[in-house]
Amino acid sequence: MLKLPETIKMVITDFDGVVTDNCVYINDDFSMSRKLNFKDVMAFSILKKNGYKIGIISGEKNSAIEILAKKFEVEEVHQNIRVKIDVLKDIIEKYNLDENEFVYIGDDVNDIECLNFAKYKITVPHAVDKVKAVAGIQVT
């Protein structure tokens, strides 16, 4: 598991493509489903058990976010956000965090502003190339 710097107090992440497999499944009734990897769900559990606050800033709105946020008592949940940087700045101000106290995890172009703003930035293997060029760390 990735060891975070000791100064980190909060992990702020995108959802689709970071916690999910970056796919949307269309059911017979035209509802949508997402697949979560238990390793990613376990990461939420480990973060909470180690005293980290968690924030989710998602460009989409879906029930998987709400279920996970409730289960792990996620402090900040923001859905259907197209421009994420303002929400990220609001969270940082609310929790009085400096650049050494949070990490941002993203995978797509709408995360680039947040990744550029963050000192500690992480992405995933299937992130778009522009994000990989910005992120400092890629986790599997």
Regions found by a protein language model. Give the residues of each.
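Mg2+-dependent phosphoryl-transfer enzymes with acidic/Ser/Thr/Gly-rich catalytic loops
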Residues: 30, 34, 71, 76-77, ...
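Short beta->alpha linker loops
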Residues: 39, 60-61, 82-83, 126
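Substrate-recognition element of Asp-dependent hydrolases with the DxDx(T/V) motif
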Residues: 44-68, 79, 115
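Short alpha-helix boundary/capping motifs
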Residues: 2, 37-38, 59, 105, ...
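Active-site neighborhood of HAD-like aspartate-dependent phosphohydrolases
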Residues: 1-53
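Short acidic, glycine/proline-rich loop/turn micro-motifs
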Residues: 24-26, 68, 134
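Short, active-site-adjacent cap segments at secondary-structure transitions
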Residues: 19-20, 63-65, 111
